[in-house]
Amino acid sequence: METRRITAEEARKLAERRLTAEERVCFDLFSLILEREDALCRSDGAHCLLAQSREDTPLWVWLSHELPEAAEDEAAAGLAESLARCPALHVTLDPDRGQGVLRKAAERSGLTPETVLPMNVYACRKLSPLPLRGHAVVPREEHRPVMATLLRQMALDAEGQEVPEAAAADFAQAMVGSDRLLLWEDGDIRAMAMIAHIGDGMGRINTVVTERNSRGRGYAGMLTAALCEKLLAQGLTPMLYADAGNPSSNRAYQKIGMEACGQVTEYRWK
């Protein structure tokens, strides 16, 4: 069956029908993308779903476990069309299922995929007890400088990107009093993390960062556990994407009771 453009509503129904519980965690970004009724979606109705908010935003590609060759060809064709419109496109999919699609899209487009970030996907259904040093606090006005600093440290250390001081200051100002961002205080502010999005029964945690001189002491795990507790109390399943190349952060998440649900990898094209 050929892929065709579908509406966000059709994509939501397809995801509910075809994705397993674990896949819905791995592709939690669909819940954010598909909040937009004008989201760009394509599917064959059974074996693949491609979705992005706009032509220049990251494309997420779900592929069924048993992927027929015809469906693989169609998914590759859809990906190649997206690359023709935006060669700088970033694409995220299951690396084990997606190699054929990547190869065929490369043949069609003349571009080569390059790994940006392999990610382990975690969900927390029950917290494990954790000894605590310090406590979580809601950000106050006096925390603006440290929030801006932590954001810039995270972007530079994790992604090699510089966040302009003005942008970091704007972020910090917006987060004062937020019910979605928490700081961990143990004498000084040691870590920061936030609930980035809530949808489809899940709460996605990101922007997890520990102050450089405080790393390796468990603060990120303690703070993530506090956010998980908050989400679980609301009947939501906490989830997050973790850099597969950072074993210490993965251990921290596992220690608080987060369970691995699968892997996805982000690619860019050259």
Locations of the language-model features?
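A conserved beta-strand-loop-helix scaffold within acyl/acetyltransferase catalytic domains
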Residues: 53-55, 163-166, 170-209
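Conserved acetyl-CoA-binding loop-helix of GNAT-fold acetyltransferases
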Residues: 69-82, 210, 216-233, 250-255
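Residue-level recognition of the GNAT/N-acetyltransferase active site
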Residues: 64, 211, 215, 243
